[in-house]
Amino acid sequence: MPVGVPKVPFRAPGDEDATWVDLYNRLYRERLLFLAQDINHEIANQLMGLMVYLSAEDANKDIFSFINCPGGSVIPGVGLFDMMQVIVPNVHTICMGVAASMGSFILIGGEITKRMALPHARVMIHQPASSYYDGPAAEFHNEAKHITMLRNYITKCYIERTDNPEEVIQRDLDRDVFMSATEARAYGIVDTVAEG
């Protein structure tokens, strides 16, 4: 029997009685966001909407983004990364489990000095990939140009946010590079590893 999303009590300011809300809504009210699936347009839009709402609600309170993400689509991932850069509150990123591919890109998008990995978390970086394209060659050429442009942007972000030289980032994005939490800290993807 599926459990579903648990309900927890929540008392809004000024209310006498608590109401039951699903766990994630309760956590969102505390500015705690979760990316726990492949990144797609739907989850990216939900998280970006929550970030805008929380920023408008109180621009002085930090937002915490917990990441256990095996990757996902490049365009929604880049949109989520960009949103993290433009909202006023600092966004803490916390890797719990795995941050692979686009998940690692979101992880580096946290406020520098506020990016963390749990002790047994794993990080994987690689270049953005195109899906197999079965269409006219001219359209494939356009997609290849777009993927190259995205790769250049992602490379630039890794260089800026990890403080590694371009040749290191270029080399490491050419293949799957897996890291422990400690290795991710040494690489500059996270700033701290939680004590465990």
From Swiss-Prot:
Record keyword Oxidoreductase present: no
PANTHER family linked to this entry: ATP-DEPENDENT CLP PROTEASE PROTEOLYTIC SUBUNIT, CHLOROPLASTIC ATP-DEPENDENT CLP PROTEASE PROTEOLYTIC SUBUNIT 1
Family of this protein: Belongs to the peptidase S14 family.
Gene giving rise to this polypeptide: clpP
Role, per record: Cleaves peptides in various proteins in a process that requires ATP hydrolysis. Has a chymotrypsin-like activity. Plays a major role in the degradation of misfolded proteins.
Catalytic reaction list: Hydrolysis of proteins to small peptides in the presence of ATP and magnesium. alpha-casein is the usual test substrate. In the absence of ATP, only oligopeptides shorter than five residues are hydrolyzed (such as succinyl-Leu-Tyr-|-NHMec, and Leu-Tyr-Leu-|-Tyr-Trp, in which cleavage of the -Tyr-|-Leu- and -Tyr-|-Trp bonds also occurs)
Record GO cellular component, one term: chloroplast stroma
InterPro entries recorded: ClpP, ClpP/crotonase-like_dom_sf, ClpP/TepA, ClpP_His_AS, ClpP_Ser_AS
EC top class named in words: hydrolase
Name of the protein in question: ATP-dependent Clp protease proteolytic subunit
Subunit annotation: Component of the chloroplastic Clp protease core complex.
Keyword Hydrolase attributed: yes
Family annotation (Pfam families): CLP_protease (PF00574)
Database matches in SUPFAM superfamilies: ClpP/crotonase
GO MF annotation, one: ATPase binding
